[in-house]
C-alpha cells in the first residue's frame, strides 16, 4: 500500500511538472517575456513597481500570475479542508531571509523557477545559477544537520491566515477596475521596448495560468529547493522529478513553438539571452544565496506563495520580505541587468550570505542552549 501511494505521488508530481512547463511556455507565446513564462521573483518585483515601491519604470506591472498562485492554493486548500491558519515561527527571521533571497534572485535575474525555464530556453548562463543553487542548498543542509530549526507554529484565527489571499484578490480588483491607481511600464516613441514589465499576456490568461500552477503546486507540494534538499538529506528524489518535468516539457514546447511559429523560443548559448547576463561567478553566487536562504526558510519562493495561500502567515511574511527586497534592490541599484551585475549588487549578495550564516549560527547556538 505504501509503495502504491508513493508511486501515485511521483506520478502526480511528474504530471504537475509537465503541465507547469507547458503553461509557462504558452504564457511566453501569449505575451510574457522570453524565458519568463513564470518567475516568482521577477513578478513580485514587477508588482512592487506597480505599487510604487520602486521607480524602475522598466519593471512595473501587477502580475496576475502571482495573484493566481496564491488564490489557486487557497481555493484548493479550502476545498480539500487543508486550509490551516498558523504562524508565529520566527517571523522576523523569515522576513530577513525572504529579503535576502530576493537580493540573490535579482543578482541572477530570476528565481529557481525561472532558472529552470532559462535552461529550457537554451540559456547556458543559467547552468552557473544551477550550480550555485545546489551549492547553497548544500550549505543549508549542513545547518539542518547541525540542528538549525525555526520555532514551532501556532494556530491562528482564520482572518489571519486569509490575509494574503484577501490582499491578492483586492489587487486583482484594482488591476481590473481601477488600474489608474497603479503604475505600468509603458512604451514611448523614444523607447518602444523599455523592459520586461511591458511584456505580458492578457490579464485573465495570466490569472488562469496562476490558478493552475498554484493548484498543482498545492496538490503536489512542489518545491524547487525541496527537491535538491530531500535528495541530499533523505535520498528522496520525488520532488526532483517535478523539477525535471518542468524543464523537459518547457524545452519540448520551446522547440515546437520555434518550429511552428515565426518567433524564436529556444536559443542555445551564452550571448544575447533574454533578461540575462553572462557573469558566471555572480550568477552562481546569487543563486547560492537563494538556495541557502530558502533551505533555512523551508521552501523556494513558489512554495512560500503556496503555503501563504494555505493560511501560513509566516510564509506570507516571507512574501513581504521578497517584496521589500525587490523594492530595495531597484531603489538602490542592487539588481543586475543584461549588461551584468552592479557593484552595489555584488556587495549586497556578499552581505546576504554573511547574514544568512549569522542567522544559522545564532539559531543553532540558541537551540543548543534550550537543550
Predicted regions and their residues:
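Membrane-interfacial helix-loop segments of redox and metal-homeostasis proteins
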Residues: 1-371
